């Protein structure tokens, strides 16, 4: 059976990444999908090869659904997680966002990182060159200390974990996306 590749957080991924993902033998796209199927439309006919799943990683139900989906689509050789660390910060001209908005956004980033990385590790066969990539969006000039701190945490987490993953014959890395799409 063909190995599955998961792209999680598709709503914040550049379209070029999604187009490239369609070259995978069994692409599975997960995230908060628009009701009007705009992502599928933008990707054209090739998007019919992919599985599309509405997954809200910020909820226990969404996390459980994703973990079940990972187990049901074995073997898994590729996981790409897009984290939107720049979703929090300032409203308008340097007016800070309310704490009740910042905390859930920061929690969503940390929970998604932990849930997806542990889930991916659990379903990937050691020694198969399976990989997980964490994509971080460009914080840009409007980056807040929280944005920068979350990005630094994700990067450091991946660096520390990648050593352990390498010992198992797996790969874990971070890619910093720059705005352009």
Please describe what each predicted stretch is.
Residues 1-37:
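Canonical Rossmann dinucleotide-binding motif of NAD(H)/NADP(H)-dependent dehydrogenases/reductases
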Residues 4-6, 78, 131:
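Structural motif
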Residues 9, 16, 85-168, 175-178:
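Catalytic loop of short-chain dehydrogenase/reductase
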Residues 20-22, 43, 161, 165:
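Hydrophobic alpha-helical packing residues
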Residues 29-30, 81, 134:
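Structural beta-sheet core signal
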Residues 41-53, 168-172:
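A short helix-to-beta-strand connector/capping loop
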Residues 51-107:
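Conserved mid-core segment of classical short-chain dehydrogenase/reductases
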């Amino acid at each position: 059976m063909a190995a599955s590749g998961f792209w999680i957080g598709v709503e914040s991924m550049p379209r070029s990444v999604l187009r490239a993902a369609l070259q995978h033998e069994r692409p599975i796209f997960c995230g908060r999908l628009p009701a009007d199927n705009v992502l599928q439309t933008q990707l054209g006919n090739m998007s019919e090869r992919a599985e599309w799943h509405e997954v809200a990683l910020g909820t226990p139900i969404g996390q459980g659904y994703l973990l079940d989906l990972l187990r049901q689509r074995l073997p898994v050789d590729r996981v790409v997680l897009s984290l939107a660390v720049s979703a929090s910060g300032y409203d308008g001209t340097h007016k800070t966002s309310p704490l009740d908005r910042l905390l859930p956004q920061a929690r969503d980033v940390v929970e998604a990182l932990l849930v997806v990385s542990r889930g991916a590790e659990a379903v990937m066969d050691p020694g198969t060159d399976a990989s997980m990539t964490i994509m971080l969006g460009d914080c840009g000039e409007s980056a807040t200390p929280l944005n920068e701190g979350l990005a630094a945490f994700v990067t450091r987490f991946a660096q520390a974990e990648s050593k352990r993953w390498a010992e198992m014959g797996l790969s874990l890395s971070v890619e910093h996306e720059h705005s352009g799409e």
